[in-house]
């Protein structure tokens, strides 16, 4: 799905601020960045929302599952709803946030990324 021009501009500005001048949504409304530590950030525009998802290498065991659930608990306060899960194919934890198109601003995207990255550090993958 093609994103509105102004959302594409926010993503480009986010990339420039992060030193990734080539970051832009493709014709499907998606962009991805892989980091040296194995973490990956994916941005995707669909259904009038921009989703930011950070994935990290992880093994699934009861302790990991409990930690994933704790991060996504309704009482956790991040300023947005956080979803957490596990991708068995590839063995990756995933943390995601959805911003409605009217909420997509450079400060909001920076805030979401900062929280996702901090959670990744706490979880043990992003550094």
Regions found by a protein language model. Give the residues of each.
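Charge-rich, low-complexity N-terminal segments
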Residues: 1-40, 77-87
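Generic alpha-helical secondary structure
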Residues: 4-7, 61-65, 109
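Short, Φ-rich (hydrophobic/aromatic) sequence segments
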Residues: 14, 64-72, 110-116
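Hydrophobic residues embedded in beta-strands of well-ordered beta-sheets
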Residues: 30-31, 50, 91-93
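Short, well-structured hydrophobic secondary-structure segments
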Residues: 33-36, 41-54
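Short beta-strand-to-loop capping motifs
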Residues: 35, 54-56, 97-101
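Short, internal acidic amphipathic alpha-helical interface segments
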Residues: 51-90
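Well-ordered alpha/beta subsegment
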Residues: 81-114, 118-127
């Amino acid at each position: 799905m093609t994103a509105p021009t102004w959302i594409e501009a926010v993503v480009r500005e986010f990339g420039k601020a992060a030193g990734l001048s080539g970051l832009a949504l493709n014709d499907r409304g998606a962009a991805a960045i892989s980091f040296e530590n194995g973490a990956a950030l994916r941005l995707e525009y669909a259904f009038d929302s921009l989703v930011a998802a950070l994935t990290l290498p992880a093994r699934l065991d009861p302790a990991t599952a409990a930690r994933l659930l704790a991060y996504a608990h309704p009482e956790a306060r991040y300023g947005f709803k956080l979803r957490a899960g596990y991708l068995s194919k590839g063995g990756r934890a995933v943390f995601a946030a959805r911003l409605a198109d009217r909420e997509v601003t450079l400060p909001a995207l920076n805030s979401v990324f900062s929280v996702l990255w901090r959670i990744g550090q706490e979880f043990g993958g992003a550094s």
